[in-house]
């Protein structure tokens, strides 16, 4: 899987689980992508910022 597909899959993972509390989401994201919860927290924040940027500028990820 290339990096573009990975980012798309991670964003899809987050969008599908929008009803989870942040603690559970961070735990499941960390397990799914093989990272620590602290790393997951940082990646989730970065993906959220990327998604907002893309929406504001009409860019498709």
Protein language model regions, located:
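N-terminal acidic leader/helix
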Residues: 1-31, 52-56
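Short, charged early-sequence alpha-helical segments and their helix-coil boundaries
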Residues: 37-61
């Amino acid at each position: 899987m290339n990096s573009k597909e990975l980012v798309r899959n991670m964003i899809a993972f987050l969008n599908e689980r929008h009803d989870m509390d942040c603690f559970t989401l961070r735990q499941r994201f960390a397990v799914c992508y093989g990272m620590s919860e602290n790393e997951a927290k940082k990646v989730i924040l970065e993906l959220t910022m990327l998604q907002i940027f893309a929406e504001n500028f009409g860019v498709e990820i």
